[in-house]
């Protein structure tokens, strides 16, 4: 069905009609039913009001259960402009900024119902319900009839409207995508200022994390009126531990604070907070996460009974007080309770969908909902399950009985009752772990509990509470047994155990989906069962169940490199090594699924890396060049504007004055931007592709080598000066660093790796966060391995102590080769060591104790690689045949800039990328006319192997990409719309079993199809596409393209039109520079701060 949006700019949108049921605009609802009810064959229509997580769960379950009878048609009306998205994962939006990544189902799902009518409205609100006529009225004026009405209107975030200043600019709530987008926009314009989250519950911690992840605010503070966070889920001990962990992460938490007033300026902008205790706090932004209010406004005019605390009152069948109207999710009030977490809503969806589709079976009842939660909040694992406050409030239930709502707390107040609950508590202040489990007085039944830091046993314990079976072990074993560690394991769980509370998925659901053949990958399991698509906390357990079920069926869980290679990276390495396969074609014929496959952007670089790790060929040799990522293809890192960086090797950070002069002369001659790197060398940016050969010729003549900054290989070995100069030095760190860098330079590995050597325990070279690091001792060096910085920093681990200098090399040889042999694709040593069975102790056994008996072989392999070393740039500049690769265009010597250059701090750089790309339908553009035009000689392209070659050509002001694949030609625009980068001709070509080809953009891996009916479509980002053109080789030796007139071509695809220009992006320092303009110090200039006159401080005062 088409997307049905509500009014935008005054528009009115009306949905389509099905099965004779009209949707009429502006007609009295009493006239609408007509003869509809008299048709005995018609399907009943269910109208769902709301399109959130619970609503879409209900629809999915209803469709599945109604697949045979096909009794119902469905209309769903959503108020937001988006289809249903994962509100639990809302904070991840800050990372990817793509709403599509949050969609619970792709847009195509909404049009996939072939056996029933399914309509959906977006941007449309239901304003009235007419139960007597069974119709609803929308904000567009449409009248929609129903047989069954399901209210899933959700809830609104609460704002403290009685607090002065609650309506100021800078006040936000954390509830919807639009809330986040407004917060992001505000934060971008208030960089460096203070943001505040009010509310210490689940939503408040999520909001605080989101504001922190924005990285725009200078600081973020959390305000909570309670004595500890998560007061509804945790007791004082547990909540205080979570508070401590959050503070350790850098978030300031203020407890027992109530907002009395919000301070504002004359323009009603937030400037601060006044608390009830008189304390004040300066801030520019306040995000309130203090609770939710059920959306029950439709109840007033409709006559639906609503609870005093809000929400449509429902019974155990989810019925409201009005016939044929049901309520589910956060808008429903059951026994005077509403539920702000998703699990009870999913349970309601289960009950209602079952009852509507199984009228001949015993109906399900919505009884005591499971309010258990397991989450990772600000990096802290938190869980509560069962009756987790039974010790504080008294048990809500006891095995074998369930007290009514009225009987709880109805005992004689003058009678002192015996406690009915015993608590078993475990605290580990060193590991940051807290557990409290609540049992009946005899210890035979588990009632509930809470966990901080270690939540592995959550699923098992929660199931024990639900089953209400007597325990088979004493309570003490629940604490002591949890200390054995290990991954989450589902082997001893019953099939009825709920593993995903967000979507009420049991272990049996996952097992059945795999055994039936419906799900063959973990992605299939997520799509089919919805497990793991909510908060994601259940994924380790889901993965464990999937793996075990596949193994039980005799099927191995795939860790294949890609669709073309049925081996893991480590297995493929062994196949290539043992069979001595030396080319991509040899590998595909011997190890690929299809011998003549082109491979893809995943397997090509991986195979190229393995071949380099084993045989060290030159990357620019014909049979290897087309396998490389763009950086390796041109022996330089590609930058934002299509230029490249130039990084000579500076071993150990030591460099002579002559080489510094040579670098400076090259940078000045070619107008390169210079920067000192963290690896103690000089990076020169802005080198044009056509200048790379000349630049490197001068550097090679000056005695310099490639620094391999472009490669998945050794980058640098950083050092402090050690005993070379430092009076505190214990060892010669520079000498050792230079020897290590000279030995391992150019060695290809699964990922880049870095080293460092410190001359003493002061650790100035930061050796303990490198892939390998040495720290000098009085007896030699301590060797550390498996560390890295980056997005997920890891401290390295000690491999060996007090190693003499002459014994360092054998140990590192074995370590590096073992990593190369066994790591997964693109896996850093940190992640490799974490996933290595046995971890550091196993690595010591292999590397130090030669447990596998391969130490000598690994040393020999490393020595062969070291002996095969050559400088890639030295060999390249001496080979004139490689010059053709270093041209901007294959058909002309002209050059153009793809991004406008700006001058800053006496250097040049490309201007900032704008936020949005080129959002035009290039694929669907209709040209006025097309004619065949010769563009380039056919002999430019290779006849293979490899079976691929490409070229970037210039036609007018337009850049075009031509690809030769297995003897056929394909042509597209050169610009990738994502970031308006002109690079597609340098992208890797992939194929599938159906003969479909695609080119993968070198920048961010957008894959564009080259052939077939969908040529030009982006496979992994439907928001963009590219233009394609007919192309062929003719007998005259030229390649011809069918193109429009040059003027028309340039008007759509011209470089000048799409070149990124200054001013398109927001200057990130605009606010900073405006605020601190002119503050340069007394000696920066005679004028001092702009607009003020310099003054002399009295001589007898301190001049601060």
Curated annotation (Swiss-Prot):
Entry binding sites for [2Fe-2S] cluster 2: 976, 978, 1001, 1004
Entries under CDD domains matching the protein: NirB_Fer2_BFD-like_1, Rieske_NirD
Chain residues that bind FAD: 44-79
Cofactor binding notes: Binds 1 siroheme per subunit. Binds 1 [4Fe-4S] cluster per subunit.
Gene Ontology MF term list: 2 iron, 2 sulfur cluster binding; 4 iron, 4 sulfur cluster binding; heme binding; metal ion binding; nitrite reductase [NAD(P)H] activity
The UniProt record lists the keyword Nuclease: no
Swiss-Prot/TrEMBL catalytic activity: NH4(+) + 3 NADP(+) + 2 H2O = nitrite + 3 NADPH + 5 H(+); NH4(+) + 3 NAD(+) + 2 H2O = nitrite + 3 NADH + 5 H(+)
Cofactor: siroheme; [4Fe-4S] cluster; FAD; [2Fe-2S] cluster
Segments forming domain Rieske: 932-1040
Presence of the UniProt keyword Iron-sulfur in the record: yes
Listed GO biological process terms: anaerobic respiration; nitrate assimilation
UniProt-annotated binding residues for [4Fe-4S] cluster: 720, 726, 760, 764
Listed SUPFAM superfamilies: FAD/NAD(P)-binding domain (SSF51905), ISP domain (SSF50022), Nitrite and sulphite reductase 4Fe-4S domain-like (SSF56014), Nitrite/Sulfite reductase N-terminal domain-like (SSF55124)
Protein keywords: 2Fe-2S, 4Fe-4S, FAD, Flavoprotein, Heme, Iron, Iron-sulfur, Metal-binding, NADP, Nitrate assimilation, Oxidoreductase
Record region (Disordered): 396-419, 1081-1104
Chain residues that bind [2Fe-2S] cluster 1: 500, 502, 535, 538
PANTHER family named in the record: NITRITE REDUCTASE (NADH) LARGE SUBUNIT (PTHR43809:SF1)
Protein name: Nitrite reductase [NAD(P)H]
Organism from which the protein derives: Emericella nidulans (strain FGSC A4 / ATCC 38163 / CBS 112.46 / NRRL 194 / M139)
Gene, per the UniProt record: niiA
């Amino acid at each position: 069905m088409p997307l049905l949006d509500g009014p935008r700019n005054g528009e009115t949108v009306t949905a389509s009609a099905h099965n004779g049921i009209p949707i009429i605009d502006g007609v009295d609802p009493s006239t609408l039913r007509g003869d509809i009810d008299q048709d005995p064959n018609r399907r009943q229509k269910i109208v769902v009001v709301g399109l959130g997580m619970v609503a879409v769960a209900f629809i999915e379950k209803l469709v599945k259960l109604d697949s045979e009878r096909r009794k119902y048609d469905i209309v769903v009306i959503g108020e937001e402009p988006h289809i249903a998205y994962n509100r639990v994962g809302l904070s991840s939006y800050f990372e990817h900024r793509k709403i599509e990544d949050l969609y619970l189902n792709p847009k195509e799902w909404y049009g996939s119902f072939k056996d029933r009518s399914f309509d959906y409205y977006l941007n449309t609100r239901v304003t009235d319900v007419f139960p007597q006529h069974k119709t609803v009225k929308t904000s567009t004026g449409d009248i929609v009839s129903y047989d069954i009405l399901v209210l899933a209107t959700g809830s609104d975030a609460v704002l403290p409207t009685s607090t002065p200043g609650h309506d100021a600019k800078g006040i936000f709530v954390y509830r919807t995508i639009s809330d986040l987008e407004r917060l992001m926009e505000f934060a971008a314009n208030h960089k460096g200022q203070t943001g505040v989250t009010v509310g210490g519950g689940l939503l408040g911690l999520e909001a605080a994390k989101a504001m922190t992840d924005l990285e725009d605010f200078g600081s973020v503070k959390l305000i909570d009126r309670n004595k500890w966070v998560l007061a509804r889920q945790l007791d004082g001990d547990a909540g205080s531990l979570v508070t401590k962990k959050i503070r350790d992460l850098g978030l300031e938490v203020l407890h027992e604070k109530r907002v009395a007033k919000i301070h504002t300026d004359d323009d009603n902008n937030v400037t601060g907070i006044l608390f009830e205790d008189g304390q004040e706090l300066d801030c520019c932004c306040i995000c309130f996460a203090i609770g939710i209010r059920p959306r029950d406004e439709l109840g007033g005019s409709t006559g639906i009974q609503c609870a005093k605390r809000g929400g449509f009152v429902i019974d155990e069948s989810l019925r409201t007080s009005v016939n044929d109207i049901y309520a589910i999710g956060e808008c429903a009030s059951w026994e005077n309770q509403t539920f702000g977490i998703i699990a009870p809503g999913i349970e309601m969806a289960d009950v209602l969908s079952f009852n509507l589709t199984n009228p001949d079976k015993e109906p399900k009842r919505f009884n005591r909902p499971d309010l258990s939660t397991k989450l990772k909040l600000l990096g802290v694992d938190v869980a509560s399950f069962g009756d987790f406050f039974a010790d504080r409030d008294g048990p809500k239930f006891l095995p074998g009985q369930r007290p009514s709502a009225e009987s709880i707390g109805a005992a004689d107040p003058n009678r002192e009752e015996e406690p009915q609950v015993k608590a078993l508590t475990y605290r580990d202040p060193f590991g940051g772990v807290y557990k409290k489990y609540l049992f009946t007085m005899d210890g035979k039944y588990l009632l509930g509990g809470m966990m901080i830091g270690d939540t592995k046993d959550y699923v098992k314990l929660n199931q024990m509470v639900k089953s209400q079976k007597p325990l088979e072990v004493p309570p003490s074993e629940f604490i002591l047994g949890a200390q054995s560690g290990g991954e989450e394991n589902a082997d001893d769980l019953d099939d009825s155990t709920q593993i995903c509370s967000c979507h009420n998925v049991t272990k049996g659901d996952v097992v059945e989906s795999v055994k039936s053949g419906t799900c063959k990958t973990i992605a299939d399991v997520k799509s089919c069962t919805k497990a793991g698509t909510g908060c994601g906390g259940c994924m380790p357990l889901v993965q464990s169940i999937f793996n075990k079920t596949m193994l039980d069926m005799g099927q191995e869980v795939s860790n294949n490199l890609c669709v073309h290679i049925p081996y893991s990276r480590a297995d493929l390495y062994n196949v290539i090594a043992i069979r001595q396969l030396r080319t991509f074609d040899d590998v595909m014929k011997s190890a690929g699924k299809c011998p003549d496959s082109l491979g893809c952007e995943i397997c090509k670089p991986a195979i190229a890396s393995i071949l380099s790790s084993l045989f060290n060929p030159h990357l620019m040799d014909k049979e290897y060049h087309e396998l490389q990522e763009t950086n390796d293809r041109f022996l330089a890192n590609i930058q934002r504007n299509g230029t490249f960086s130039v990084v000579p090797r500076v071993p150990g950070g030591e460099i002579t004055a002559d080489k510094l002069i040579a670098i400076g002369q090259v940078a000045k001659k070619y107008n390169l931007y210079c920067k000192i790197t963290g690896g103690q060398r000089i990076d020169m940016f802005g080198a044009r592709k056509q200048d790379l050969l000349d630049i490197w010729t001068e550097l090679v003549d000056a005695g310099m080598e490639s620094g391999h900054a472009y490669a998945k290989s050794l980058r640098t070995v950083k050092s402090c000066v050690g005993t070379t100069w430092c009076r505190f030095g214990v060892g010669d760190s520079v000498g050792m660093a230079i020897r290590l860098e000279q030995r391992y330079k150019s060695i290809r590995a699964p990922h880049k790796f870095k080293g460092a050597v410190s001359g003493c325990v002061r650790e100035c070279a930061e050796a303990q966060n490198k892939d390998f690091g040495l720290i000098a001792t009085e007896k030699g060096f301590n060797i550390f391995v498996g560390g890295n910085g980056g997005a997920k920093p890891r401290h390295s681990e000690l491999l060996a102590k007090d190693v003499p200098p002459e014994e360092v090399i054998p140990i590192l040889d074995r370590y590096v080769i073992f990593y190369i042999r066994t790591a997964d694709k693109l896996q850093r040593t940190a992640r490799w060591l974490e996933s290595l069975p046995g971890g550091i102790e196993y690595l010591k056994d292999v590397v130090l104790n030669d447990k596998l008996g391969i130490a000598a072989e690994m040393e020999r392999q490393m020595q062969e690689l070291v002996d095969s070393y050559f400088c890639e740039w030295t060999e390249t500049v001496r080979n004139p045949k490689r010059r053709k690769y270093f041209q901007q265009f294959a058909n002309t010597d002209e050059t153009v800039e793809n991004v406008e250059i700006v001058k800053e701090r006496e250097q040049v750089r490309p201007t900032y990328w704008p936020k949005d790309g080129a959002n035009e339908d290039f694929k669907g553009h209709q040209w006025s006319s097309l004619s065949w035009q010769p563009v380039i000689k056919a002999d430019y392209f290779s006849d293979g192997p490899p079976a691929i070659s490409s070229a970037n050509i210039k036609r007018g002001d337009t850049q075009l990409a031509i690809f030769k694949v297995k003897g056929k030609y394909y042509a597209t625009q050169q610009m990738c719309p994502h970031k308006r980068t002109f690079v597609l001709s340098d992208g890797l070509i992939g194929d599938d079993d159906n003969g479909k080809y695609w080119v993968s953009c070198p920048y961010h891996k957008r894959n564009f199809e080259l052939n077939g009916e969908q040529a030009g479509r982006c496979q992994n980002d439907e928001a963009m596409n590219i233009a394609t053109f007919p192309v062929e080789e003719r007998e005259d030796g030229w390649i011809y393209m069918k193109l429009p007139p040059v003027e028309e071509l340039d008007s759509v695809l011209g470089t000048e039109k799409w070149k990124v220009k200054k001013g398109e992006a927001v200057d990130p320092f605009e606010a900073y520079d405006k605020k601190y303009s002119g503050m340069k110090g007394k000696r920066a200039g005679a004028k001092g701060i702009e607009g003020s006159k310099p003054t002399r401080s009295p001589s007898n005062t301190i001049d601060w």
